[in-house]
Curated annotation (Swiss-Prot):
Homology family: Belongs to the herpesviridae major capsid protein family.
Protein's name in the database: Major capsid protein
Pfam families in the record: Herpes_MCP (PF03122)
MF GO annotations: structural molecule activity
Subunit note: Homomultimer. Makes the hexons and eleven out of twelve pentons. Interacts with triplex proteins 1/TRX1 and 2/TRX2; adjacent capsomers are linked together in groups of three by triplexes, heterotrimeric complexes composed of one molecule of TRX1 and two molecules of TRX2. Interacts with scaffold protein; this interaction allows efficient MCP transport to the host nucleus. Interacts with capsid vertex component 2/CVC2. Interacts with the small capsomere-interacting protein/SCP.
Record flagged with keyword Endoplasmic reticulum: no
Listed SUPFAM superfamilies: Major capsid protein VP5 (SSF103417)
Organism: Epstein-Barr virus (strain B95-8) (HHV-4)
Function summary: Self-assembles to form an icosahedral capsid with a T=16 symmetry, about 200 nm in diameter, and consisting of 150 hexons and 12 pentons (total of 162 capsomers). Hexons form the edges and faces of the capsid and are each composed of six MCP molecules. In contrast, one penton is found at each of the 12 vertices. Eleven of the pentons are MCP pentamers, while the last vertex is occupied by the portal complex.
HAMAP family given in the database record: HSV_MCP (MF_04016)
One GO term describing the cellular component: T=16 icosahedral viral capsid
InterPro entries: Herpes_MCP, Herpes_MCP_upper_sf
Length: 1381
């Protein structure tokens, strides 16, 4: 070596510090390395590469893995060098365990000693690393440096080779640490499982299904209360240190302290020599928090071995037995220790050589490690995260977890007559408030409102509006239910036009009184409807938009069919009660700025009139003679005025209030003081109310046009021209055929009028008196001699288009009148011939001896007319009766009943059966709707009028019974028929499953309190259940009639804690093996393989893991909703203009002018361009489950299944797929979680229900929802059953290991993590089939109060509610300076 001066003058400054490089390398690597360098001779690089393998083998044999021994992770291991490890093929070690017994003094027979053989499997692990050495460096090493430059190159080559070797050694060191950590994780079940199963309070009872149910409950409790405990401690205030200590102590206590190496303690504290009881492996952040919370012990060092003990196999069989805590090496050792010297106590010094030779001579060195004191245990704490960070590898203790959250939108709380808040002040009348939105808080504490607008991309999609999948599911069932409906499924066409005969034949000697399912549902409260005993009705309540029934196909096979419910009012009463409908009505008032014209006095007057048993029957005669003709009304103004004034003065009630045309004509012609001002004011208010309601409906619908049609007909049935008034005097039928494009059919008897060209065949136009004067004789002859039963012509006046008069008439008959009268009315047929004879065939009417001004009663003989006038308390003049008689000249002969059938609108036409796509109604032609008759009235009028119960609003059995004796007999024979919804009506006139108005609306009308709210409620009940209606209601914040359960899955980045007890794993370190992988001209690549083995030495689970803190929430916890138009692009409504309108309104993804990729119709997912940027993280997708508004709000205040019925069946006695399916889907059994009901949401929990077909991939025709569906795990049948089976097996496997069943040589049970545990830890909601409640409130005021400084808040405020977040992740909510944890 040259002098220092020479070195300084050379351009190789690094040589100044490497003067003793060779000696250092000899000491640090191996003496044989450089000795072997001298053996390499020759210039062939390949030959040199081959020979260098020998060198490398010598070098790697010197690897000591000292770094692992210097980690706290080694505390939990007994580390032994086992040079013969490569010869081991099937490693098993047996341990003998004697079970202690208790000696009893009560005479019981002593227990025999029981000894079991525990078999521990040895698992091999292979780690390897790669080293690449340059041929140029090797050649330089073989040369002899002579010049300073050569010497510098020589030193550089040595450095390069040594660096490559050191790189490989470091990789192997890290590989050993990673292997040990992986082994620990393989034996570390989650804390919430281990803590429950290790509790003898549960396990000593065995593992029956009752105990398993308790175990699952404890799983959930520990998961909720103890996950992420460091986050909870941060905001706990005082006592946080004790809380953290208790959680860590529970981890220490949960694992088994028993080990087959009992007494072995290779690591102790530096001061005091106290054994280290185990180690917590944590992340850097958790380590800092723990030391901050608990403080570090003064003794922050532990003493550990600096080398490995040697494991030597001696004898043919190596048997290590543990008996009474003593370690034996062989059976001879067993005999010497237990038999020969039973009193001699074992010690660590004497026991340890039984396992590892030379352990007592191991040198010990201090190791820097954090130590915390938990009770009487000293426990080391270490983070290995830096090693993984340096190598850019994921740290095993950092995990991604997915938690599902759910919250309700639009629940209705019946009778909300109280509040738990004294701070909130809302509207003047808060008792009728109806929630339409849910306020939630995203992860960045931004307050967001989830309302109907957010859900339109789901609610307006065709998949929600089709029953096809539901029907396929039902028809695929083994057999339909026993009870099949036969009544009111289809309209039956009569072969004649005599309505009186139809009614007589139907009720004459009728004994059977079937009740439809729709009517049966109306009579049940929500609790009874959802009860398991009501399964027969509940099983067909699968879809909120359809009534499902059992019909027959052409082959007389029973098939399920579905008809659209059309309107919100047709929802079953248990799922949409009357109070809810009235609350919707109030929302409708507010949203449309409806100012009622009528007041309560008018409503009460109308109601008094309807229930007036002395209502003058003569008024019906007057109304029949006028029958909607304005000309005839003008002719009879004096008589009409007399009727109104007399009735008003006598009783304070309104005449003719049952007829829209009469009210319209009264308002138009009697405003000149012809009648009482008070009475006229009431008529005007009634008519004004109709106009106000019509204008409110127009504001609701808006002015949009879809194609050539107003959007109003898609929004509200009252605005749909295809719905006709219940009575007709003018030719509204031909007008319907002209304006409707929905294939209307006018069924007249057994004839069908469907083309305006056939109008002369079916319509007999009746003009005014002057026009018809020449036909009076012909009309008379027809009335006397015509075959009226088989004459299918309708005598109607010409249709007069008066703007929105048709809508006003429908509002009157379908809203105002049934609401104010409680539907206490019935259709009334008129025998015009007999009425004419009663009026005209008397002396004063046609004799010239009487003047017009004479009182007719003074000159009238006894007869029907006199009786009518007397019971009506009316004294008309002779002229009035003559004018009324003259009105008969153009009257028809009888009242006719016509059936009108039309297609549903295109959004409600998705039923598979063509007949189910149509809706029907009966219209009385030249008929009336009347109030109840008194006994005296019926005796007088029985030959003039007859009852026609033809409509849900105009078929009250109590009223019909007063008009028709057969009806009265039928009702008396069947008392249940007194209910409006249950009353049987002739099938030629009524078929409930085909009607616009069905039992729920009839029940509401019959039972509502006549009021302004009821009028608004009935109006809102006519809003359709269609996409356009949902769009309109979303715009005005009106409740759509159904609630929603919103499900969202959020992803959490968690930092976990692993605890492992001391000596719980025995690690065997073998010898390395070097092989050449690749030899090139420029370099040689070597692989170093190292074998290791591990044995779990614990007598139970000796390690556990639990989430300690939330590192980050990766999703935004927001309100982004699944776009079904992108998920299911192939499904559409039958009209392209309608599709385009809906997509434009809901903001569905569109591809511009580009044609859709045909592959998307198969794959089901279009290329949706995401947002250009994100502010709150990855958008969490929300999905909608349609839910009844009567769902129990308490259900959403704890973790439950979003389906509405528990789906975790782990408590089965023996897992069987058929049993599991029964517990999940069989609603004849009670819900396992709520035994008093089958479900909280029949529209989602049953097979084939709407929720099931939306999110169960069994029904997919194109694809399942999106790239990710948070609902799929709760609905997909295969996945649901797989998770159930996995959880069942997991609980059984853990129970077998922890339930006191010792292992034997036959079972060889190992204490490892059961398959599926990681999924359970990371996705617990999928296994438990429950979602966690998210913080939400139906009003922002409740959120504000929740964030106030008060300790308590208001969970209920009249109709509003707040749901607290109950989830493993406890979020810190901060608005301004207000913080809530």
């Amino acid at each position: 070596m040259a002098s220092n001066e020479g070195v300084e003058n050379r351009p190789f400054p690094y040589l100044t510090v490497d003067a003793d490089l060779l000696s250092n390398l000899r000491q640090s690597a191996a003496e044989g390395l450089f000795h072997s360098f001298d053996l390499l001779v020759g210039k062939d690089a390949r030959e040199a590469g081959i020979k260098f393998e020998v060198l490398l083998g010598v070098y790697t044999n010197a690897i000591q893995y000292v770094r692992f021994l210097e980690t706290a992770l080694a505390v939990s291991c007994v580390n032994t060098e086992f040079k013969d490890l490569s010869r081991m093929t099937d490693g098993k070690i047996q341990f003998r365990i004697s079970v202690p017994t208790i000696a009893h003094g009560d005479g019981r027979r002593p227990s025999k000693q029981r000894t079991f053989i525990v078999v521990k499997n040895c698992h091999k692990h292979h780690i390897s690393t790669e080293m690449e050495l340059s041929m140029l460096d090797l050649e330089i090493l073989h040369s002899i440096p002579e010049t300073p430059v050569e010497y510098a190159e020589y030193v550089g080559a040595v450095k390069t080779v040594a660096s490559a070797l050191q790189f490989g050694v470091d990789a192997l060191e890290r590989g050993l640490i990673n292997t040990v950590l992986s082994v620990k994780l393989r034996h570390a079940p989650p804390m919430f499982i281990l803590q429950t199963l290790a509790d003898p309070t549960f396990t000593e009872r065995g593992f029956s299904k009752t105990v398993k149910s308790d175990l699952i409950a404890m799983f959930k409790r520990h998961l909720l209360e103890h996950s992420f405990f460091l986050d909870r401690a941060e905001n706990m205030g005082s006592g946080f240190s004790q809380y953290v200590r208790s959680r860590l102590s529970e981890m220490v206590a949960a694992v088994s302290g028993e080990s087959v190496l009992k007494g072995v303690s290779t690591y102790t504290t530096a001061k005091g020599g106290e054994p280290v009881g185990g180690v917590f492996i944590v992340t850097d952040n958790v380590l800092r928090q723990l030391l901050t919370f608990l403080g570090e012990e003064a003794d922050n060092q532990i003493m550990g071995p600096s080398s490995y003990a040697s494991f030597v196999v001696r004898g043919e069989n190596l048997v290590t037995a543990v008996s009474y805590g003593r370690v034996m090496r062989t059976f001879e050792h067993f005999m010497a220790r237990i038999v020969d010297s039973p009193e001699k106590a074992g010690s660590t010094k004497s026991d340890l050589p039984a396992v590892a030779a030379g352990v007592e001579d191991q040198p010990r060195v201090p190791i820097s490690a954090a130590v915390i004191k938990l009770g009487n245990h000293a426990v080391a704490v270490e983070s290995l995260q830096k090693m993984y960070n340096d190598t850019q590898s994921p740290y095993p203790l950092n995990r991604r977890m997915q938690y599902s959250y759910y919250f309700p939108v639009g629940l209705f709380m019946p009778n909300p007559k109280y509040t738990t808040s004294a701070a909130i002040k809302m509207l003047d009348n808060p008792t009728q408030q109806l929630p339409v939105e849910a306020w939630i808080v995203n992860k960045n504490n931004l307050l967001l409102a989830f309302n109907l607008q957010n859900a339109l991309k789901v609610l307006c999609h065709p998949r929600l509006h089709t029953p096809a999948h539901t029907l396929n599911s039902l028809n695929a069932a083994p057999a339909p239910r026993d009870r099949r409906e036969t009544y009111s499924l289809q309209h039956r066409r009569p072969n004649h036009m005599n309505v009186l005969v139809i009614v007589d034949e139907f009720y004459d000697n009728k004994y059977a009184a079937p009740v439809t399912d729709i009517a049966l549902k109306c009579g049940l409260p929500t609790e009874d409807f959802l009860h398991p005993s009501n399964y027969d009705l509940l099983r067909l309540e699968l879809h909120p938009l359809y009534d499902i029934y059992i019909g027959r196909d052409a082959g007389e096979r029973a098939r399920h069919r579905a008809v659209h419910r059309l309107m919100v009012g047709n929802l079953p009463t248990p799922l949409a009660p009357a109070a809810f409908q009235e609350a919707r009505g109030q929302q409708f008032e507010t949203a449309t700025s409806l100012a009622h014209v009528v007041d309560q006095a008018v409503i009460e007057t109308v109601q008094d009139t309807a229930y007036d048993t002395a209502y003058p029957a003569f008024f019906y005669v007057v109304e029949a003679m006028i029958h909607g003709f304005e000309e005839k009304f003008v002719m009879n103004v004096p008589l009409v005025s007399l009727c109104i004034n007399t009735y008003w003065e006598r009783s304070g009630r309104l005449a003719f209030v049952n007829s829209f045309s009469m009210i319209k004509f009264i308002c138009r012609h009697l405003g000149n003081n012809a009648i009482s001002k008070e009475a006229y004011s009431m008529y005007r208010k009634i008519y004004g109310e109709l106009i106000a309601l019509e204008q409110a409906l127009m504001r609701l619908a808006g002015s949009d046009v879809v194609g050539d049609e107003s959007v109003g007909q898609y929004v509200c049935a009252l605005l749909d021209p295809n719905l006709l008034p219940p009575v007709a005097y003018t030719d509204i039928f031909t007008h319907l055929l002209t304006v409707s494009d929905r294939a209307p059919q006018i069924i007249i008897g057994n004839e069908v009028y469907a083309d305006t060209l056939a109008a002369p065949q079916f319509i007999e136009r009746v003009g005014n008196m002057d026009e018809m004067a020449a036909q009076f004789v012909a009309l008379y002859g027809y009335r006397v001699n015509g075959d009226h039963d088989h004459d299918f012509r309708l005598h109607l006046g010409p249709y007069v288009d008066e703007g929105h008069a048709d809508v006003l008439e429908k509002i009157f008959y379908y809203v105002f009148l049934p609401t104010c009268t409680n539907a206490h009315m019935c259709g009334l047929g008129v025998d015009f011939q007999h009425v004419a004879q009663t009026l005209a065939y008397n002396g004063p009417a046609f004799s010239h001896h009487f003047t017009r001004d004479e009182d007719i009663l003074d000159n009238l003989e006894n007869g029907t007319l006199r009786d009518l006038l007397e019971i009506s308390d009316l004294r008309p003049t002779v002229g009035m009766i003559r004018d009324l008689s003259a009105s008969f000249m153009t009257c028809p002969t009888f009242t006719r009943a016509v059936r009108v059938s039309v297609d549903n609108d295109v959004t409600q036409q998705l039923a598979p059966n063509p007949a189910d796509k149509r809706t029907e109604q009966t219209v009385l032609v030249n008929g009336l709707v009347a109030f109840a008759f008194s006994e005296r009235t019926r005796a007088v009028t029985q030959c003039l009028f007859h009852a026609i119960p033809f409509h849900m609003f105009y078929g009250d059995p109590r009223v019909a019974a007063t008009m028709h004796q057969d009806v009265a007999t039928f009702v008396m024979r069947n008392p249940q028929q007194r209910a409006v919804e249950a009353f049987n009506r002739p099938e030629q006139l009524f078929a409930e499953y085909r009607e616009w108005h069905r039992s729920p609306m009839g029940k509401y009308a019959a039972e509502c309190l006549p009021s302004l709210v009821s009028i608004s409620g009935m109006t809102a009940m006519h809003i359709k259940m269609s996409p356009m209606a949902y769009i309109a209601q979303a715009k005005l914040k009106i409740h759509p009639g159904v609630a929603m359960t919103v499900v969202r899955t959020d992803e959490i980045l968690s930092e976990n804690i692993l605890f492992s007890s001391r000596a719980s794993t025995s690690m065997f370190i073998g010898t390395p093996n070097v092989s050449r992988r690749e030899a090139r001209v420029d370099a040689v690549t070597f692989e170093v393989h190292h074998e290791m083995a591990s044995i779990d030495t614990g007598l139970s689970y000796s390690s556990t893991m639990t989430p300690a803190r939330v590192a980050a929430i990766t999703t935004d916890m927001g309100i982004h909703t699944q776009d079904f138009f992108s998920v299911f692009p192939a499904e559409a409504f039958g009209n392209q203009q309608v599709n385009d309108y809906i997509k434009a309104k809901v903001g569905a993804q569109r591809n511009g002018t580009l044609l859709r990729d045909p592959r998307t119709y198969l794959a089901g997912m279009t290329n949706v361009n995401g947002a250009p940027g994100l502010c709150h993280g990855q958008q969490a997708t929300c999905e909608i489950i349609v839910t009844p508004v009567t769902a129990d709000v308490a259900y959403f205040q704890k973790s439950n299944s979003p389906r509405g019925r528990a789906a975790c069946v782990v408590s089965c006695e023996n897992y069987n797929q058929e049993v599991a399916e029964g517990l999940i889907y069989d609603h004849s059994r009670p819900d396992a979680a709520y035994e008093y009901r089958s479900t909280v949401n029949p529209w989602a929990s049953q097979l084939g229900s709407l929720g099931d077909i939306m999110y169960n991939s069994s029904y997919r025709q194109t694809a399942v929802p999106g790239l990710y569906s948070p609902c799929r795990a709760f609905f997909n049948k295969e996945e649901l059953l797989r998770n159930n089976r996995g959880l069942y097996n997991m609980v059984n496997e853990y129970s077998q290991r922890l339930g006191g069943h010792p292992a034997t040589s036959n079972t060889e049970v190992q204490f490892v993590v059961i398959a599926g545990t990681d999924v359970f830890l990371e996705q617990p909601c999928s296994f438990l089939q429950e979602a966690f409640p998210a913080l939400s409130a139906s009003s922002r005021a409740l959120i504000d109060e929740f964030m106030s400084v008060k300790q308590t808040h208001a969970p209920i405020h009249y109709g509003h509610y707040i749901i607290e977040e109950v989830a493993p992740v406890r979020r810190i909510l901060k608005f301004g300076n207000k913080v809530v944890f």
